[in-house]
């Protein structure tokens, strides 16, 4: 995922924009993806060379936030054995069995796929819970790399999540501590 895929280049003037709680339509001037001005009337000299987009009174809202996602689990239903019961506990068991078979590159590819879907639905901030009970930290390493790579287009917060429990087995608490130190 490259910033260029999701960044707006050049200047655009969005006209006849409806903002929440306002009756009067406004215009929004955007230059290289940055909001420069929101006003009822933007002087013509400020919009020379801008591509104009008429929104015909459509509502423009801030981007959405997804406060609870597990990006290391996205698109994993086809991995390993099927969750026959459909229960959370069997799902956790199936994940435990398959998570050790992935590389950081494979995990990153799935994380990027999940982020793309989120962004296409208007999400620009995600808090993801990443399993830190994998002693190789594959998911966490992948998520940390992705967070750095998308920082200009997405706010990605990472929570160190002990999927199999902090105290459920010997050393679980140490894995969580190590995951927290990693970032």
Regions from the PLM with identified roles:
Residues 20, 77, 129:
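Conserved residues at the C-terminal ends of beta-strands
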Residues 65-69, 97, 121:
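Single, functionally critical "micro-switch" positions that shape active/binding sites
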Residues 39, 56, 162:
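Residues at the C-termini of beta-strands that transition into short coil/loop
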Residues 74-107, 182-183:
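Active-site gating loops and adjacent loop-to-helix segments of metal-dependent hydrolytic enzymes
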């Amino acid at each position: 995922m490259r910033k260029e895929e999701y960044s707006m280049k050049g200047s655009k003037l969005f006209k006849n924009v409806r903002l929440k709680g306002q009756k009067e339509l406004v215009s929004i001037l955007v230059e290289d993806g940055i909001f420069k001005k929101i006003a009822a009337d933007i002087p013509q000299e400020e919009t020379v060379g801008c591509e104009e987009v008429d929104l015909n009174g459509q509502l423009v809202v801030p981007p959405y936030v997804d406060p609870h996602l597990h990006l290391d689990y996205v698109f994993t239903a086809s991995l390993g054995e099927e969750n026959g019961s459909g229960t959370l506990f069997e799902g956790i068991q199936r994940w435990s069995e398959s998570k050790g078979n992935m590389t950081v590159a494979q995990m990153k590819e799935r994380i990027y796929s999940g982020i793309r879907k989120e962004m296409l639905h208007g999400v620009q901030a995600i808090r993801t819970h990443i399993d830190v009970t994998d002693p190789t930290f594959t998911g966490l390493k992948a998520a940390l790399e992705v967070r750095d790579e998308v920082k200009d287009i997405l706010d990605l917060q990472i929570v160190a999540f002990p999927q199999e429990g902090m105290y459920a087995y010997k050393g679980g608490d140490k894995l969580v501590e190590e995951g927290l130190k990693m970032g």
